[in-house]
Amino acid sequence: IPHGKTQAEYSALDTQGVLKPFVTRYPELQAHTLQPEIYKEGLYHDCDDDITQMAKMILSHEPVATGITPLQLTDENFGSIPRYYIECTEDRAVTPFIQQKMYTETPCNKVYKINTSHSPFFSRPQELCDIFFEIAAL
């Protein structure tokens, strides 16, 4: 996401993502959560059911500020670090359209594609680690 933009701006453009109707807002906490009934379809559709059950125990509130605060990026910091993106081609939470928009507007050294849901660390951990090892060797 480029300098001065917010995650919420990109989320608003994502008409195919399945999570929005399942967000519960807690204004008093300045936070929101996902309703558990969307976990499987929205985050873990290619994972074993025990992963979804574990998620129900560990996923928690997310601060609203992280999505509405414009990013402040500088060439000295963000611009000096090589960037790589791992596109999850079957992601239903942050759809490929939005992922492509993000990495196109904030160019990367390389884009990797992995045929997974939003959670490749659970569904394809070895393939994800192989990508990390390749990046680390660059």
Predicted regions and their residues:
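Short glycine-enriched loop/turn motifs at secondary-structure junctions
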Residues: P36-I38, K113-I114
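Flexible "cap/lid" loop of the alpha/beta hydrolase fold
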Residues: I1-P36, T66-G67, Q72
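Plant-biased detector of terminal regions, especially N-terminal secretory signal peptides
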Residues: P36-E37, F133-L138
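Short, glycine/charged-enriched secondary-structure capping and boundary segments
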Residues: Q7-L13, Q99-K101, Q126-E127
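Helix-loop "lid/cap" segments that line or gate small-molecule binding pockets
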Residues: E37-D46
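Conserved serine/cysteine hydrolase catalytic core
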Residues: D50-I51, M57-F121, P125, A137
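Short, basic/glycine-rich phosphate-binding loops at helix/coil junctions
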Residues: A31-E37, D50, P82
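Short, amphipathic alpha-helical "lid/cap" segments that border enzyme active or binding sites
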Residues: P125-F133
